[in-house]
Structure formats: structure tokens, C-alpha cells
């Protein structure tokens, strides 16, 4: 009986650690996506039909601006969620209220931003009454490459977030309630060992 409970505790603790690690990965990827997209600028486009030079930036495309804003906000919210996950107490009402809200808001931001960015993949803009494809013009390679890298990094953040949610709601981790998530060195391990300790020595 004792060994069975210890295995359940260790399994729940491992799932908690995996979920926490994935949350940190999501945070890093969201920040990276926003930074890559925000710095994808200062690229001079030479128009084939003799039009004036045009410096293209991510700000010329609404979906890319949304990706920067949404990823930044999502990263900030994910940082708060990580803090609450690590530092919350068993009866921490703020954590119990905020965590579900954050867990619902972050995926919406990341998924919608990624979808919008991919939908605008055929980047073009109007110049001199004509529509010009950014990635088909000269000197656009660096800008297009960086934008697409940011899009795939944002997609990776969404995938990591999905895996984190799956791990969080895994059957074994569901028994671990909102308490402290104690697998990674938290003091909730000692609390969970009490029933087992009592059961082991009650017959002596």
C-alpha cells in the first residue's frame, strides 16, 4: 500500500515538473517569436517597375503587429502563471482564481496570433497603385526569412502549450489538485507522505 502511494506521488510529481518545464518553454518561445517579428524591419524593397524604394517593416502587416502584441502579452501572462504555479499555497484563493483565467487566455492569444500570421504568409503591399509581393522582390530575403522564423517559433510555442495542457490534465496529475504541485522539491511532498506514514506504522 505504501509503495503504491509513493509511486503515485512520484508519478504526479514528474508530471508536475514536465508541465512546469513546458510552461517555461512556452514563455521563452513566445518572447522569441515577438522579438524576431519586432526586429524584422529595415529591409529596403526595390520595385521591379521602377517605383521608389520602400522600407518594409512588420508594422506594414496587421497580423504581424498582432503577433508581436499577442505574444508579448501571452508571455507576460505565462510568466504570472508560472509564478503562481510555483509559489501558490494550498489554500491560495488568488492562484485558484487567476490560474484558470490565465490558462484560458494564453492559448487564445498564441493560437490566434499564429493563425493570423500564417494567413498573411503571402506578404504584399500596395505601392504606386499596384500590389507588390514582398518575398518576390529583391533584397527581401532577410525580412521574409526572419518573419517566417518568427511564425514557426510562435507555432512551436502553441504546440508546447498544447502538450503542457495535456500533461496538466493527465489522469495521474488530476489527483494532485490545486495544492502545490509538489514534485520539484516543494514541501507538499512531506504533506503527502503523512497518510502513508500513518498507514505503515499503524499496525506496529
UniProtKB/Swiss-Prot annotation:
InterPro entries (alphabetical): CASP/CASPL (IPR006459), CASP_dom (IPR006702), CASPL (IPR044173)
Gene Ontology cellular-component terms listed: plasma membrane
Transmembrane segment boundaries: 20-40, 64-84, 98-118, 147-167
Region (Disordered): 173-204
Ranges per topology, Cytoplasmic: 1-19, 85-97, 168-204
Membrane side Extracellular: residue ranges: 41-63, 119-146
Taxonomic path: Eukaryota, Viridiplantae, Streptophyta, Embryophyta, Tracheophyta
Protein name: CASP-like protein 1U3
Family, similarity comment: Belongs to the Casparian strip membrane proteins (CASP) family.
Main localization, broad class: membrane
Keywords: Cell membrane, Membrane, Transmembrane, Transmembrane helix
Pfam families on file: CASP_dom (PF04535)
Amino acid at each position: 500500500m505504501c509503495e503504491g502511494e509513493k509511486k503515485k506521488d512520484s508519478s504526479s510529481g514528474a508530471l508536475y515538473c514536465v508541465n512546469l518545464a513546458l510552461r517555461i518553454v512556452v514563455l521563452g518561445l513566445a518572447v522569441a517569436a515577438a522579438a524576431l517579428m519586432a526586429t524584422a524591419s529595415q529591409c529596403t524593397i526595390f520595385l521591379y517597375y521602377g517605383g521608389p524604394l520602400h522600407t518594409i517593416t512588420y508594422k506594414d502587416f496587421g497580423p504581424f503587429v498582432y503577433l508581436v502584441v499577442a505574444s508579448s502579452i501571452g508571455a507576460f501572462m505565462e510568466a504570472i502563471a508560472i509564478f503562481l504555479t510555483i509559489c501558490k499555497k494550498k489554500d491560495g484563493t488568488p492562484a485558484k482564481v487567476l490560474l484558470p483565467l490565465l490558462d484560458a487566455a494564453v492559448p487564445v492569444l498564441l493560437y490566434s496570433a499564429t493563425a493570423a500570421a500564417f494567413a498573411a504568409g503571402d506578404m504584399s503591399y500596395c505601392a504606386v497603385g499596384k500590389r507588390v509581393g514582398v518575398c518576390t522582390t529583391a533584397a527581401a530575403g532577410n525580412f521574409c526569412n526572419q518573419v517566417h522564423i518568427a511564425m514557426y517559433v510562435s507555432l512551436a510555442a502553441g504546440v508546447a502549450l498544447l502538450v503542457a495542457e495535456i500533461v496538466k490534465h493527465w489522469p495521474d496529475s488530476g489527483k494532485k489538485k490545486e495544492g502545490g504541485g509538489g514534485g520539484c522539491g516543494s514541501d507538499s511532498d512531506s504533506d503527502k507522505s503523512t497518510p502513508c506514514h500513518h498507514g505503515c506504522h499503524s499496525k506496529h
